[in-house]
């Protein structure tokens, strides 16, 4: 039987693009781990993706994951759009390169051994873990320490 893990994620960007951060909380039984990091120049969508990626990459064995995000971009991208992108060699339906392809590919890899249920929650609606992730992400965005090497303006 796989371990059942809950993951809560959020991304934040002060300006878009601008300094950004992500926050994630992993919960297994009564154990909890909080993750966050800030980037000097990025976008909100990249930080939403990073929150999910880093949280999944933190897991050390195959798990059954309930991943909660307030990002429709992440949820729809990973449950719907990614299948077409992969069929079209990471191009959109109108043959343009997929935005944030580096992170979509990394997320696809991070899912690997896990069974992930992607659950959308309304942001800024009083959901305690989402509020905590938002605070982690905003705090990290306010004190960025890393460069988002995959971000390209435009």
Curated annotation (Swiss-Prot):
Compartmental location: Cytoplasm
Disulfide bonds: none
Catalysed reactions, semicolon-separated: Endonucleolytic cleavage to 5'-phosphomonoester
Binding of Mg(2+) 1, residues: 10, 48, 70
GO molecular function, one term: RNA-DNA hybrid ribonuclease activity
Pfam families the UniProt entry points to: RNase_H (PF00075)
Assigned GO CC terms: cytoplasm
Chain ranges of the RNase H type-1 domain: 1-142
Keyword list, A-Z: Cytoplasm, Endonuclease, Hydrolase, Magnesium, Metal-binding, Nuclease
HAMAP family: RNase_H
Full protein name: Ribonuclease H
Species per Swiss-Prot/TrEMBL record: Edwardsiella ictaluri (strain 93-146)
Lineage: Bacteria, Pseudomonadati, Pseudomonadota, Gammaproteobacteria, Enterobacterales
Gene name per UniProt: rnhA
């Amino acid at each position: 039987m796989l371990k059942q893990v809950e993951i809560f994620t959020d991304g934040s960007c002060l300006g878009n693009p601008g300094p950004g951060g992500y926050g994630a909380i992993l919960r297994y039984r009564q154990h909890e781990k909080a993750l966050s990091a800030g980037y000097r120049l990025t976008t909100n969508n990249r930080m939403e993706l990073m929150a999910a990626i880093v949280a999944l990459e933190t897991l050390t064995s195959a798990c059954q994951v309930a991943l909660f995000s307030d990002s429709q971009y992440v949820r729809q991208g990973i449950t719907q759009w990614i299948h077409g992108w992969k069929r079209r060699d990471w191009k959109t339906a109108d043959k343009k390169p997929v935005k944030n392809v580096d992170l979509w590919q990394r997320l696809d890899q991070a899912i690997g051994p896990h069974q992930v249920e992607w659950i959308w929650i309304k942001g800024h609606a009083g959901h305690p873990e989402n509020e905590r992730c938002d605070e982690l992400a905003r705090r990290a965005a306010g004190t960025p320490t890393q460069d988002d090497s995959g971000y390209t303006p435009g």
